[in-house]
């Protein structure tokens, strides 16, 4: 069918002039041919046992912390959860006094970061010993590059009111920036990578792929069994991820929306990378596939609401969603009918599979989520057509819903239920505060990377423009304000995670990982809407090139 036949051509249409996808289905299927044979699987199992024995055998606390840090950064900590839990709990109970008296910046920073990541409160006063009489971090710390890098990473686990960690972040950042021209190339590369995006904010799968190479070159620190296990595990997961991506690719090809609706973003690979960022572990294939479908549908409908659709059409579509009635399809413009049917079919399929797998009926719950999302989206359309600029607070109250992340996360929760036996869809309320806090920062990341281009092509003012209008300031000042909000909101998230002792740790990790995926895409670019050559290289490293 010619795409024009599905498009309403009455009236002037806005266009984002999106670049076509740099991936087509043939390219995806041809490039995803990794293999993992029985011999490799046997070797993987034997190496896993060797790493477990190594975790048991290492007694010295700093050595054990260093080993745990390597295991986490190599992306294989999920294979050793109980051993790591036991080790960190023991260190937390027995090592505090020792680490506070050693005056070892690397040890103190590593202890602080790993224990806080684990949900244990460690006082930031552990860093007082590294300050001079004037209350400044000692200049001599500049001689300890590894300690500085560790301090820098630890500072991002701070919560509100911990000024010593704000000082640590400022000191370590400026000192590392000054050191970069004077250190060896491999160390300068590590510093540059950390300063670009700290470990706590970075997408774990991307970090793992990079760290395998870093760890391989670090002959003083490297353990060959751990390196080989991480390499095999990465390749094993890559095969699973390839299978997931192929499955979603067939579904996307079947819908054929990019051809039928020529104005939309075709972002299959980008959507899948986000889903892997959200949940990379092997058992969560169905979660990844559902999240990818969600993101693709949200993106299509976002392009209709924000760019292509007239206000009348958007209102009609929104009414149809609120009715959630198959019969409403006949009232929609022809180009919207396929989107509406795709939405209903996708949600009904998710509800059906969840009922089959868990016995839980989640259909009403899912419908409520989608209605909430579209009601927020239509409000932004009304703002645009009325040329209304909301205050930053008013904008964010709505935009943290319209971003779509609440939908993706709650769908992820539903898909994870069969792996969380003590959880139920009725329990999701206890996660809403954490999800809401995450979505607030997610929206700010998105606006940070996309707002300039979106305003140029005609869209509702974003967070930066809302603050510029409200405070009568320049874009530079507004961006600095948004950057500060992101930093402060991360602190609030850190604190909420420390309190979240009654929440499922797998899902809490998924919430934070969704935000890390947002940081990956939007920290310094619009990596989703306008992916560049670097993005394609990163995607190939994750899904096509074996280690």
Swiss-Prot record:
Task performed by this protein: Sesquiterpene synthase involved in the biosynthesis of volatile organic compounds. Mediates the conversion of (2E,6E)-farnesyl diphosphate (FPP) into alpha-bergamotene. Does not use (2E)-geranyl diphosphate (GPP) as substrate.
Domain of life: Eukaryota
A Pfam cross-reference name: Terpene_synth_C
Keyword Phosphoprotein belongs to the record: no
Family assignment from sequence similarity: Belongs to the terpene synthase family. Tpsb subfamily.
GO BP annotations, alphabetical order: diterpenoid biosynthetic process
An example molecular function term from Gene Ontology annotations: magnesium ion binding
Annotated Mg(2+) 2 binding sites: 302, 306
Residues reported in the UniProt entry to bind Mg(2+) 1: 302, 306
Keyword Electron transport included in the entry's annotation: no
Enzyme class, UniProt record, top EC level: lyase
Intervals of motif DDXXD motif: 302-306
Designated name of the protein: Sesquiterpene synthase TPS3
EC number: 4.3.2.-
Pathway assigned to this chain's UniProt record: Secondary metabolite biosynthesis; terpenoid biosynthesis
Gene3D superfamilies: Farnesyl Diphosphate Synthase, Terpene synthase, N-terminal domain
Entry's cofactor comment: Binds 3 Mg(2+) ions per subunit.
